[in-house]
């Protein structure tokens, strides 16, 4: 008597990730697992799906990302990405944890359970990221340890405090050992590290990295034994420069990641499906590109029976019409065809903004006989260039112009102070922008051409409880982010519309052709080269110390 299973998919060209080939075959699926790939006379199915010669690939996996960067709660994020073929993400809730601590992690876990998307979490390793900024929380090893028993938790997220690892900081090493003792693994964050420094990370079992910006850096990480996550996000556009490092011989050690990508960019160009398209357009075989986007990511994160279309694997799959400019026709997650669910975003107790700024606080004294240290934006990268240049001043104070913009970071949790600096590359002709998204501690960050609009923007953030603001001659445009000042309680369609309005308002005061808010958010991250600013002042990555505006 034939055994009955849930689904029989016929007439499909199915990706074999083990041989990097497509073969015409069939899939038998029972509940959430693939029972068999191929013909079987002893099986029958409750439902049959005729793929009509279309292609089937495993569900795409984002190997490293932050849901908060989409400005969406997890349940709304899933509604946006699943139609792009994404069936699984490995997320680091570092952003909300920096604001709300343990309760932030608990919120992300609970909110994600409304989603059909598989959301795995890596526990934030560095809250705060460094001692050079004030955060809303401090998470020691003992606070993280209970989470390792949660099924959705997959390990320790990007270890970004290299000095703590190198100097054998007790708490950092306890976090690493706790993850490994629980049978989990540890992600790296090796921005700016030399080959010798990479070896230190590997010594302690840190086994992945997503910070390569070019092929040589990717080869260095590969040679050191890392799994390399090839990043293509909103700001960090690294994939094209890394692709030359990938070959048939080494492809198994590469995966795709977005890291930080806005909802607008996901809607317009895609998520990991965009990584795949870039790879194919660059000459990579579709079979290899889809394997990197699925099975390799699952392997890097030690996800058993995930990422392949054969016996015993979870039935996560995507049906596409062609291999060149592929269009996604259907998505199956755990044996169920995806239909967008009706869900409501869960609230998070309000995180009030506690800061005080005056116009006098924003003034920046400058000696016009000396050059100043200036942060220069690198388009489509989160690294910056450290410049020393003459800057405009008047009556002993810095004055912004079309080249140089003032930047301020104000501590938002305990009103502990602020840092003021100069940034080049925002191309602002008027007004100001401000945000409660400032990696990784998410203090208030403001950039502007005049102190009055900058102060108005900051005060508007307090009024709306966090978010993003554009001010143009007193006219204010806002995108409220009620969840910790990082995520919206609204639907993904509403957030995309509000962000479009915000970007349109910014376009009236700047000629910048890339996302200003995501770019601005990384100007406060001191663990990324080269010159950044925190609530404590101007920070030089190369010396790992604070410096004055002028020597």
From Swiss-Prot:
Disulfide bonds: none annotated. GO terms for molecular function: adenine deaminase activity. It is an enzyme of class 3 (hydrolase). Its cofactor is Mn(2+). The keyword Manganese applies. The keyword Manganese applies. It catalyses: adenine + H2O + H(+) = hypoxanthine + NH4(+). GO terms for biological process: adenine catabolic process. Its EC number is 3.5.4.2. Transmembrane segments: none annotated. InterPro entries: Adenine_deam, Adenine_deam_C, Amidohydro-rel, Metal-dep_hydrolase_composite, Metal_Hydrolase. It comes from the Bacteria. Keywords: Hydrolase, Manganese. PANTHER family: ADENINE DEAMINASE, N-ACETYLGLUCOSAMINE-6-PHOSPHATE DEACETYLASE. NCBIfam families: ade. Belongs to the metallo-dependent hydrolases superfamily. Adenine deaminase family. This is Adenine deaminase. It comes from Leuconostoc citreum (strain KM20). The lineage of its organism: Bacteria, Bacillati, Bacillota, Bacilli, Lactobacillales.
